[in-house]
């Protein structure tokens, strides 16, 4: 029997299993249990949620392996963890710990401003952020098994995630309409690898799932992103920076599943308490915009 562990097909299939669900950032076992009980399909283990990373400034790195192992031991759902863009060793360390997915994340301070990881070299599937089809196709060519919008992490402001989801989906429609002889020029102009564009054109969609991330703070935000075509939702700071994390977690999971049931979403939104404090994007300096990290 052929061993297919870690092949592109297997890794993409693992990511596909999370479709329609919510993945929540957690910093300890207690939060991980709250996420699992609320119905999260996976958790992201890290030292600080994006809002705290943004507030603290400085250099943000991979979480202490003790935190990752604590979370892995507390829940039965898949556990993800973040490494810095281009940091070969952080990725290998996380793989050695046995995490289910690695997020090569712009939320952390990049280790390499030129190269992303060759994700095909790893057995574990990778998640990466994207703002447009060029970024999406490059990450897929490198071996990403799951994509997510970059949005603007830690802001509680959905506007950038909306922009990125609409941009990617509009460009998918454009690629699907191109003639074969036009595809190479489009690849040149966008920096998108030609073979990935051919696959997108053939499928009429990305060949991997694309989740919403970066600014989801309410049940309505989650439902909005699903309506715009997201395959699922990442919630970073929106759960555990809210007034009532357990309530927000359950409500966001329900709203993601029933994203066209407006009466239910209205009911879910009642009595939740305050959502996380938001940040207006225009107030951020260029160097504070995490979405600009990577290429």
Swiss-Prot record:
What is annotated as the active site? 82
Concerning Pfam families, the annotation shows:
SOR_SNZ (PF01680)
Q: Which UniProt keywords apply?
A: Lyase, Pyridoxal phosphate, Schiff base
Enzyme class, broadest EC rank: lyase
Q: In which pathway does it act?
A: Cofactor biosynthesis; pyridoxal 5'-phosphate biosynthesis
Identify a single GO molecular function assigned to this protein: pyridoxal 5'-phosphate synthase (glutamine hydrolysing) activity
Q: What EC number(s) has UniProt assigned to this enzyme?
A: 4.3.3.6
Residues where D-glyceraldehyde 3-phosphate binds: 166
Q: Which reaction does it catalyse?
A: aldehydo-D-ribose 5-phosphate + D-glyceraldehyde 3-phosphate + L-glutamine = pyridoxal 5'-phosphate + L-glutamate + phosphate + 3 H2O + H(+)
Q: Which residues bind D-ribose 5-phosphate?
A: 25, 154, 215, 236-237
Q: Which GO terms describe its biological process?
A: amino acid metabolic process; pyridoxal phosphate biosynthetic process; pyridoxine biosynthetic process
**Which top-level group of life is the source organism from?**
Bacteria
The record's listing under NCBIfam families reads: PRK04180.1, pyridoxal 5'-phosphate synthase lyase subunit PdxS
Family as reported in the entry's similarity comment: Belongs to the PdxS/SNZ family.
PANTHER family, from UniProt?
PYRIDOXAL 5'-PHOSPHATE SYNTHASE SUBUNIT SNZ1-RELATED (PTHR31829:SF0)
This chain's function reads:
Catalyzes the formation of pyridoxal 5'-phosphate from ribose 5-phosphate (RBP), glyceraldehyde 3-phosphate (G3P) and ammonia. The ammonia is provided by the PdxT subunit. Can also use ribulose 5-phosphate and dihydroxyacetone phosphate as substrates, resulting from enzyme-catalyzed isomerization of RBP and G3P, respectively.
Subunit structure and binding partners: In the presence of PdxT, forms a dodecamer of heterodimers.
Q: What is this protein called?
A: Pyridoxal 5'-phosphate synthase subunit PdxS
Q: Which organism is it from?
A: Bacillus cereus (strain Q1)
